[in-house]
Amino acid sequence: MAIGNIAARYLSSLEETDTTATTTTTTTSNVLQPSNRLNSPTKFNRKSLDNNSQDLDALARALNITPSKPETPTSISKGSATSLLRTKFESPSATVSSFKSTSSSNGVSPTKKNHFVEITSDETPSWANKNYKDILNKSPTKFNTQSNVHTPLKQLNQPIGTPSSSSLSPAKNASKSSPGYEYLCRIEAIKQWLESVLQEQITQSASQLISYIRNGIHLAKLANVVLPTSKPVFLNDSKLQFKHTENINRFFQLLDFFNMPDLFRFELTDLYDAKNVPKVWFCLHALSYILHKQDPSYPAMNNLVGKVDFSADDIRTANRALVNSPLPNFSSADTGEGKSDTSNNNSSTTSATAAFMDKVTSPVKKTPSPLKRPQQLQKKQLELVEDNKPELTQDSSGLSKISRDDPFTDRVDLAPPSTSNAKLELHTPPSKSLEFKIKSPIIDLSHRDSDYYTPELESHLPNIIKFQSLARGAVFRYLMFVDRILLKSYQDEFTNLFAIIRGNKARRKTVHKHRDELRLYSFEIIELQSIIRKNFVINKKPNFTSITNDVETVELQSLIRGKLTRDWKKYVTNGLEKFTPQIIDFQSLVRMKSIYSKSNKVISYKDEILPSLIELQSIARSQLYHRFSRSNAIDETEIIKIQSIIRRNAVIEDLYTKLSKVRSNKRRLIELQSIARGGVARTKLCNSVLVTLIYEDGILNQLFAKIRGDNYRKKFNSQKSELLKYEKSSIIPVQTLFRGVLSRYTKEVTLSDIFDQIDSVITLQSVARGKLMRGSIYEFSDYYQKHIKQVVKAQAILQRVFAQNAYKQLITSKNPPLKVIRRFAPLLSNNDRDFQDEMTLSDLKDLIIEKCKANEEYENQIEQLDMKLGLLDKNKISIEEFLKPTKGKTFKPIVENVKNLERLNKSLKKKIELWQTLFYFIQTNPIYLTKLFNSIPYTKNQTKSGQDLFQSVIQLFPVRDSSITYHSREEYFLVKLMIQLMQNDTANSNNLGDITKLHLTNWIDFFTNFNNHTFQRQHLKALLGKFVIRIVDNEQVDFESDPIRIYNQIIDHEMKVYGRSEKSRDISPQAAIQLPEVSNKFVGNLMSLRETCSDLLSMLQKNASGNKALLQIPDHVKLICRQGYLCAQRKFPDKSDQQHLAVAGVIFVKHYLGSILQVPENYGILTGNNDTQKAKSKDNLRYLYRVMLQLFSMKPFNDNFLKPLNEYIMASTDTVKSIISQAIINVGEIETVYELHDYDDLVTHQRPKLTISVNSLIQLEKSILQNVDIITTGNDDQLYKTCVEVEKLLISPQDMLTLTDLSSVTLNLNPTTQEESIVDSKTKTLFTQAKRCLLYIIRVQEEDDSDDLLELLISGIKPSHEQRFKEIVQYEKAEQDISLNNSKSVTANTVNKKKSTRPYSGTSLGDLSNLTYHELKKMCLEIILKLESMGELTRKNSFQTLLNQIAMDIKTKDSQRQCRWQQLQVSQKTIKKLSEKENYLKTQLHNYKKHVESVLLELQSKSKSNDKNWKRRLFNIMVIPVFSKQYFYHRELRKHNRLPKFGSYKYSAKKLIDQKVLIDFSTANNVATASKLDFMFSCHQVGKFTIEVASGTVNIPGATNTITLDELLALQYENKTKFELFDGMATFDSNNFMGLIFRKFYDLKKE
C-alpha cells in the first residue's frame, strides 16, 4: 500500500473549522493538563518546523491533493494542511517526522532529534510514571495516526496551498488568532484575579508582566495573603537579583501547603531563568481554581479570550516569549462556567473535569483549614509596602505617571467602564476524557462532508490503527531504552537525590507536626507577626534628620529644579511644535482681525484711490524695466570670464591654505593615520572581543558617564574655585549693586503705574480673585460630584491613616499631645456602665470595711473573754470547769511557744498586739517596703546595714510549706513585693539593660533568695540536672573559644606526650587562630557548643509545646518574667517587641536558669575528680551560659572569638521568641495563678501566723519608725497611726530584756482592712474633677488647634462655646433620664443608685445645668492650681501629667473594665464570706458568754440539796461559829427575809484594815469611829457584788456601791493596786479585795 495514500487519507480526516479543531484538541487533552509533548508545541527551533511543513506540502503536491477553495498563503485561519496540523495539534506527530526526508535531518533520526528533547523536559506528567501499557490503551486514534502503507486516494478538487516564503513568522504575528493574543488574555485574567486577592493595584501591563513576574514579588505577596504565616517580601524590582529566588521559594511553600500536584508545578529555573514562564501562569490558573474550590470567598478566574484588546506590539512581544516555551492548555483549566454544548461529549467532559479537580483539591479538603482572609494584615502590609513607593497617579492601564497640569490636553478620565457586573461568558470548548481503546477506535463521522474525506480509507482503518500502535511501541521502546541508559549513568546521583528528598519529607513532617494546633491560633499569630513586621519596617525607615542644609545639598536641589524646569519647558515647546499649523492659523486670524478694519475702509474708498494706485504701479514697473535693461546691456561672456578667474584664484588660495596647514601638521597627520590604521588592524583582530563588549555596552556607558561626570565635576569645581576667589570681593558687591538699582527702579516704575490706576487695579484684583475663587469652587464641586465614590474612599483612607497615626502616637508616646487626646476623648464620653460599676465597687469596698470592723469587734470581745479566763485561772478558779461541758472553739494566746509567757506584762502584750497590726500592713502592702528600699541608694545594698535589712525583710515572708504545685500565702505576698520592686526599679532605669542589672535593682536579691530554697533547687535540678551532668561527665566535650588557651592546651598535650614542645607560648590570639590545629580545634569547639545549645533549646521548646509529662517552669519565674516584659513595654514603648521579649529572656536565663550552670555544686552536681577536670567543666558550663544568655537576649556577640555564632543566634531568634512567648510569659495575673487575693485573710477564721526572731523584729520596727514619713502618704495612713501608737508605748529595760530572752516569737497577725488615706483620696478626687472638667473643655473647644493644654485653658471664651456647652449638658441630661428609667434595681447592701451616669460625674461639681462654660473653666483652673500647690502638677510642662492620666484611661479602658469586673466578683464573694464569718462570730460570742455565766453561776451556787450539812455550810465555805457576829448577821437577814441569793458577809473596818483589804477611809460627819464601822459584802446576782457601810445596826445613807467581776478583773489586768469606792471616801487594795471576794463567793481550786 502506498505511503502517500495513507497520509492523504489521514490528512483528509482532519477538521477544517475552528470549533471542530478546538474540540479535537480538547478531546486529546486531559483536564488541567500542563503543557507537555501531547498537547503543546515542544521546544523545537523554528527551522525544523518549517522543514516539516515543506515536506508535507511537497507530499501533497505529489499526490495531487487540492482543497475545495483556494487558500491565501498568509492566511492563518484558512491555512494549508500543514498549518492545520500545526495549529490543531500544536506538536509535530510521528506522521510529520515519518514524511521528512533523511537529508533534511542532518544525519539525525526524527526520533532522536525531536523526542530526545522531550525526555529531558521537566513537563512530563505524573501519569508518565505509571503502567505504560494502560497509557497505550488510552492513546487517541486520531492523534498519532501514522502508517507507511500506500492506499489510493480520491482526487481532490483543488491543490493544498502551501505557505509562501513571505508569510509572517509567529514572532511577528499580531493577529488575535495567534497564541500570543491568548497568552496575553490569560495573563490579564490572572492579573485581575491577583489584584482582587492581594487588594492592591498591579501597575504592570500584561505584556510587562511576562518579564516582571520573574522577580516573584506578586507570588510572594500571594503566599503571605493565603498562608497562615507571613514573611518579608524582597520588593526591589529595579533589576533581577538572586535574592528574588526567596520570593519564588515562598510561593513554593504555598504550593506545598495546598499539596499542589506535580502536574501543575514549575521549577525555579522555569521562572527565574525564563525557561518556561507560561507554565508559571498555568500554575497560577490552576491555583485559582483550587482556592475558589476550597474557599468561595476567593474569586474565580475569568476567561477574557476575545474580550480584551491589546496593541500589535504587545501581541508580538507575547509571541516572541512563546518561541522557546509552549503555550499551556489554559482552556482545560477553565471551570466550565461558560455556555456548554448539548452534546453528550460536553457533559461527560464537564463531569470528568469536576472529578479531576475534586481529586486535585482532595488533600486540602481532608483537613478543613481554619484559614480566613486576614484583611487587617493585608492592609498593614500594603501600607508598609506603599510607604517606600513614590506618590504616583495610576491610570486605567496601570502605568504610573506624574500628576501635573498639561496645558495642551484636557483632563479626560481614561478609566474603562467597570466590568464588575458584566457577565463574562467563558467560551470553553467541550472536551473529552482521555480514555481510548484500540479495539474500538473513536471515529468522528462529521468529516464525511469534508472535501478531504476518502471512503476508501475506512476499509484500511484497522491497518492504520495497527500501524499507529507499532509506531508508538517503537518510539516508546526507544525512549525507554534511552531513559534506562540515562538512569543507569546517573544511578549514584539519583540515590543521593532520593535520600535528600526522603530527608526533606521527614523534616517537613517534623516541622509541620503541630500545624493543626497552630492553625487554631492563626489569628493571634497573624496579629503578632503584623506587629513584628510593623516594628521591623519602622526600624528600617531611613533617618532624614541627619541631613544638613549644606551647600552641596542646596546645589543638588538647584540642579534638580533646573532639570525639572528644563524638562517642563521642553515639554511645552514640543507641545507648541505639534500644534504649529493651528497656532499659525490662529495668529493669522489675530493679524487679520487687527487689519480688517483698516482694509475695510480702504476697500470702501477704492474707486477714489484706484487711479492713483494704478499710476504708482506703472511708474514702479517702468523703473524696474529700466534697471533690467541696463543690466542686460552688459556683456555676459566677459562677466563669466571674470567670475572664472575669481573662482580660480579663490580655489588656488584655498588649496594653498590647506596645503600649508597640512605641511605644518604633517607629523600629527602621520600619527593620526598610524593610529587609525592601528585601530583598523586592532578592530579586525579583536572582532570577537568587541562582539563580547557589545553585551557590556551598559557597563561601558556607565563607565564613560562616570568619566564624563568626573571631568565635568573637575571643570565645574575649577570654575567654582575661581569664582569663589572673587566672590566676596568683587562678584557679590557688583551683583548686589546692580540688583539693588534695578529692583529699586523697577519698583518705583511699577508703583507709580499702579498708583495712577489704583482704583482700577483694586477693582480688577477683586474681580480676578472672585473669578478664580468661583472657578475653583465650581471645579471642585464638579470634580467631587463626578468622583464622589473616589472622594469618599480617599477620605476614608485619609481618616484611617490619620487615626492610625494618632493611635500609634497615643500608644507609643510617653507624653501624648493635646491633639491626640482630643481625637480620642469621645471614648470617655460614654462610660455609663463603667461608672456604675465603679460606684458599685466603691460601695462594696465600703461594705467590706464595715463588716471587717464589725468582725474585728467581735473578735476583740472573744479575746477579752480569753483574757477573763486567764485572770480567773490566776485567781485560782479552775478553767477546766469552763472547758468540761463545751466543745466550742478555744482561743489561743497571742504569743505561742513561749516558755516564759507568764512573764509578759501588759505593756509587752500591748506591744505585741501593735506588732501584729504593724507587720500585717508591712507584709500585705508591698508599697511600704518598696518606698523603704527606694529611699536607700543602690550602692548601699551590699553594705552590712543593707544586708541586715534584707535579711529582716526576708523573715517577713517565711516560705516553708510551699512547693512547685502548692503556693503558700507568704509566697504570694513575696512575689507581689518582687513585682512592685521591679516596677519601681524600671521607673528609675535609663535603658532596657538596667532592668536586669543587680547593682541597679532591688528585686533581684529577693528573686535569687527565693530560688535558693531547697524545693526550688530540687525542681531546677530535675529540669536540667541530667543535661548538666551529661556535659560534666563527658570528658571529650570542650567549649573553649579562646585561641590562646586552645594553643596552650595543644602545647600541654605535646609536653605530656612527647616531653617537649617546639611551640612558643609567646604568641598573639590573631597568630594562634591562623595555625591549622588551633583553627580546627576552635571550629570543632564552637560546633559542639552550638549543638549543645540547640539541644537545650529543644528541651525548652518541648516544654513550650505544652507537654504535661515534662517539668514545668515555676509560676513565680513566669510571673517575674512577664512583669519584666510588661514593665519594658510601658517604660520603653518605642522599642521593638523583640527587645521587650529579650528582657524576659535575660531574666529567665541570667537569674534562674543560669544558677545551675554557674554554680552546679549548689545543686549536688560534682564537676570533676581533679582540679583540671573541674576547671574544664566549669569553663564549659560558663561558655554554655554565655551563649544561652546571648540567645535569649537575641543580640549578637561583640567578642571576636564568639562572633562566628552570631549567625546561629540570629537564626534561632524565632525559636527563642516562641519559647519566651509560649512557655515563659504565657501566664495570667498573680491572683489567678495563686488563686489568692488580699481579702483572704479577712474571711478566714484563723489568723495568719508569723514566726520571726526578736532581733529582726526590733530592727524592722526601727527602720520603719525612722522612715515612716517616707513610706506613708500622710498622717491619716493606717501604718502611720500604728507607728505613732508604737512610739507612744514605752517599755522598761527589764521588759526589753525579757523580750530578747524569748529568741523568737510567733505572732498571730491582725488582718485589718487597708483604707485609703485622706491625702490620697483628696488627690484622686481632685484629679477626677480636673479630668471631668477638661473633657468638657476639649469637647466644647474642638475647633481650637492649640497643642498646648495651658493655652487651651487660658484661651478666650466665645458665645459659640457657651451654646455648645449647653447642648452637651442637655444631651447628657436626656441620656441620664433614659438610663435611670431603664436601670435595674440593685441590692441596697451592695450599691446605691447614683443620679449621674457621666464619666467622673460622681465628684462634687454640682449641677452642670446651672453652670456656665465660664464658671466651668474657672472651676477647672482652680482645681488644677490646687493640684499644682500640692506638687502633683506643674505648669512647666503645661500640666502634661493630667493629659497622661487621660491617655492612660483611654488606653487601659478595656483592661480597667476587666480588672473592675474581677474586683466586683471578688468583693461580692468576700462580702458573702464576711457575712458568714460575722454570723459565726456572733453565735460563738453569744454561746461563749452564756456558757461562762452558767459556769460562774454554778460555782457560786453549789447544789445545796446534795450537802447534808447545808445548814451548817453556806456557799461552800468554813462553818460559821455559833453566836458569832456573822451568825447574828445572817439570822437578822433571814428574819427579815433579806438574805442574798449567793450570800452576804459583814466585817468591821478595823478587821479589813488588819487584813490589808481596806487601806483608808473617812466618815462624813464623824458619826462613828473605826471600831464601830462595818462593811457588808453581798451578792444578789452572778458576778455583781454590793458593798454597804453601816454604823452598828444602822446603814449609812448613800454608802452603797456595786462592783462587777469584770471590773475587778480589769483592775487586775491593768495592774492597779488600789481603787476607791463611796465617792473616794474608802480606798481598797485591789488584790486583797479580790482575794476576799473569791474566797467568800467562789469555789477555789485546791493547790
Curated annotation (Swiss-Prot):
Query: What is the superkingdom listed in this entry's lineage?
Result: Eukaryota
Which SMART domains does UniProt cross-reference here? CH (SM00033)
**Can you say where in the cell this protein is located?**
Bud neck
Stretches assigned to the IQ domain: 467-478, 528-539, 556-567, 586-597, 616-627, 642-653, 672-683, 734-745, 764-775
Q: Which residues are annotated as modified residue Phosphothreonine in the UniProt record? A: T66, T72, T82, T367
Phosphoserine modification, residue list: 48, 83, 91, 139, 165, 167, 169, 369, 433, 440, 1064, 1068, 1088, 1383, 1385
GO molecular function list: actin filament binding; calmodulin binding; cytoskeletal protein binding; GTPase activator activity
Query: What positions does the domain Calponin-homology (CH) occupy?
Result: 184-291
Q: Where is the composition biased (Basic and acidic residues)?
A: 380-392, 402-413
GO annotations under biological process? actomyosin contractile ring assembly; mitotic actomyosin contractile ring assembly actin filament organization
Induction info reads: Rat catheter biofilm repressed.
Tell me which Gene3D superfamilies the record gives: Calponin-like domain, GTPase Activation - p120gap, domain 1
The Low complexity compositionally biased stretches are 19-28, 163-175, 342-355, 368-379
Share the record's PTM remark.
Answer: Hyperphosphorylated. Phosphorylation is cell cycle-dependent and peaks at the time of cytokinesis. Contains 21 consensus sites for cyclin-dependent kinases (CDKs). At least some of them are phosphorylated by the CLB2-CDC28 kinase complex. Mutation of 15 of the phosphorylation sites to Ala caused both premature assembly and delayed disassembly of the actomyosin ring, blocked interaction with the actin-nucleating proteins BNI1 and BNR1, and resulted in defects in cytokinesis.
Which residue numbers delimit the Ras-GAP domain?
958-1223
The entry's keywords: Actin-binding, Cell cycle, Cell division, Coiled coil, Phosphoprotein, Repeat
PANTHER family (alphabetical)? CALPONIN-HOMOLOGY (CH) DOMAIN-CONTAINING PROTEIN, RAS GTPASE-ACTIVATING PROTEIN WITH IQ MOTIF
Give the comment on domains. The calponin homology (CH) domain binds to actin filaments and is required for their recruitment to the bud neck. The IQ domains provide the interaction surface for the myosin light chain MLC1.
Subunit (UniProt): Interacts with myosin MYO1 and its light chain MLC1. Interacts with BNI1. Interacts with BNR1. Interacts with CLB2. Interacts with CLB4. Interacts with CDC28.
Return the protein name: Ras GTPase-activating-like protein IQG1
